[in-house]
């Protein structure tokens, strides 16, 4: 899920949920201006984590065309909302680079912030060692879904120690 489509896919009280596994991106409870409902959030925090370990530069190459086309004013507003956590200098620099059309350079600052924040949050997760499964991937690709499903199937066949 991303902040862009989170609100569209979250279940409503009258929606029927699938009975099998549901794969969600590990996110903060608040994504942009949207909050993940409390019960779903608690369930996510207790569930297995399949971490796709993709090189930084590959992820950066992926997000620039995907997010770089979004409305610049909305991107700036989002940066301003996280400016205290990002650091005022980093926020000002990211905004300036964005205004200059240097999207990759701006997003590099933001992705470094995201990674730092995510890893801190991940490593504060209760029972992380038992929940975390790392899957090494070379790039951002639809093939990663196949790799992930193979790894998950193999892990479910592994006897518990």
Model-derived segments and their meaning:
Residues 43-49, 53-161:
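Conserved NTP phosphate-binding and transfer environment spanning the P-loop NTPase/kinase superfamily
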Residues 1-43:
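Conserved nucleotide-sensing/catalytic segment adjacent to the nucleotide-binding pocket
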């Amino acid at each position: 899920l991303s902040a862009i489509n989170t609100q569209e896919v979250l279940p409503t009280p009258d929606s029927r949920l699938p009975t099998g596994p549901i794969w969600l991106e590990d996110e903060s409870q608040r994504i942009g201006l949207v909050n993940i409902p409390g019960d779903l959030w608690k369930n996510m925090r207790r569930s297995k984590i399949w971490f796709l370990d993709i090189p930084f530069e590959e992820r950066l190459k992926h997000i620039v065309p995907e997010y770089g086309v979004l409305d610049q004013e909305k991107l700036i507003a989002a940066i301003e909302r996280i400016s205290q956590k990002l650091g005022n200098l980093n926020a000002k620099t990211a905004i300036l680079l964005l205004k200059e059309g240097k999207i990759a350079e701006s997003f590099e600052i933001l992705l470094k912030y995201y990674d730092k924040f995510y890893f801190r949050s991940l490593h504060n997760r209760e029972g992380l060692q038992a929940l975390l499964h790392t899957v090494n991937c070379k790039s951002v690709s639809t093939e990663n879904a196949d790799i992930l499903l193979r790894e998950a199937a193999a892990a479910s066949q592994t006897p518990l120690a």
